[in-house]
Amino acid sequence: MTRDEIVAIFQKTGAMLSGHFRLTSGRHSNRYFQCALVLQHPDYSELLCRELAARFAGDGISVVIGPAMGGIIVSYEVARALGVRGLFAERENGVMTLRRGFSIEPGERVLVVEDVITTGGSVREVMEAVRKSGGTVAGAGVLVDRSNGAVDLGVRTEALLTAEVVSYAPEDCPFCKQGIPAVKPGSRKI
């Protein structure tokens, strides 16, 4: 798929939002990628995740895992495309954990996936959970990298769409200074 084809899917589904947003990282931005609006369409989910999976075909991946909430559908669809298990990690007492009977066997090659990264914090937390379980993080795949490639996860990282989106610390946010309320569209702490 070309970048233009991927952008067209995000535009068609209304997933590229403009306004004043408080991101999961705590930073503020005037742009937000609401991947749930894309992922609600099974055909688009399959298409995008199949493209992401293709970038890791032949890498010996045996498990795909993503953080709840944004990584659940991505994990499932990428795992389906690779013909492997798809798991998700959840926060328990503030720590990303494997729950619901999920496990990773020592030495399994694991692909960590997510819908959107800005700072990479959630992906790093999942990577740590994988390593604590004895798995080997073989790579990371994301639908959208808001850092435009600036985030270094320490493993090969593939993004379907990279975008340089300005974000601000809350104290430096021009929208806050104008008194414009921030919207928190993500899933953390709901």
UniProtKB/Swiss-Prot annotation:
Family matches, as PROSITE patterns: PUR_PYR_PR_TRANSFER (PS00103)
KW Protease (keyword) present: no
EC code: 2.4.2.10
UniProt GO MF annotations: magnesium ion binding; orotate phosphoribosyltransferase activity
Pfam families for this protein: Pribosyltran (PF00156)
This protein's record includes keyword Phosphoprotein: no
Keywords: Glycosyltransferase, Magnesium, Pyrimidine biosynthesis, Transferase
Cofactor(s) demanded: Mg(2+)
Coiled coil regions in record: none
Binding site for orotate: T118, R146
Catalytic activity: orotidine 5'-phosphate + diphosphate = orotate + 5-phospho-alpha-D-ribose 1-diphosphate
Function according to Swiss-Prot or TrEMBL: Catalyzes the transfer of a ribosyl phosphate group from 5-phosphoribose 1-diphosphate to orotate, leading to the formation of orotidine monophosphate (OMP).
Subunit structure: Homodimer.
Protein name per the record: Orotate phosphoribosyltransferase
Organism: Pelotomaculum thermopropionicum (strain DSM 13744 / JCM 10971 / SI)
